[in-house]
Amino acid sequence: MSLPIFNFTKIESTNDFARSLITEHKIFKGIIIADEQTKGRGRYGNQWSSPKGNLYFTIFFPILRSNLKKIQFLVQLQIRNILKSYNIKNVSLKWPNDLYVNNKKVSGILQESIVFGKLFLIVGIGINVKSSPKIKKYPTT
């Protein structure tokens, strides 16, 4: 499957941009990549710190409702496998959307779906590569 790619130096949110591509521009599949997000978010609208030097991207496409739950776990497994392929050890999964290395969060996945004529899946992924912001109370980004 060939997907259009949208690259940004800075964007508010890759997931929000995917939603606008679907609903406003009638583009129904693609990949959005950003060097930095100014309004990145996780589950429940929690802020996802998105400074330069890390990976932020969203993949969006039409999907059957019966496949929705499978995708989240498959994405987690693939990210874990990629990290392990770089000889990163002690990678663990925290259902439903986080990956940890040495008990510190290094990746978050935000899966959203919308109906616009048919069902679309929007999967946002953030991976700390260069920086892992310090949060006083929780070891997350």
For the regions a protein language model found, what residue spans apply to each?
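Acidic (Asp/Glu) carboxylate-rich active-site/surface patches
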Residues: N81-G117, G126
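Short, glycine/acidic-enriched loop or turn micro-motifs at the edges of active sites
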Residues: E12, T38-K39, V101, I127-V129
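Glycine-rich, flexible loop/turn motifs
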Residues: Y44, P51, P96, S131, ...
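N-terminal lobe of the biotin/lipoate ligase/transferase fold
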Residues: M1-S85, K89, S107
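Solvent-exposed residues in well-ordered beta-strands and their adjoining turns
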Residues: F60-L64, E112, N128-K130
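Short, acidic (Asp/Glu-rich) active-site segment that either coordinates a divalent metal cofactor
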Residues: K118-T141
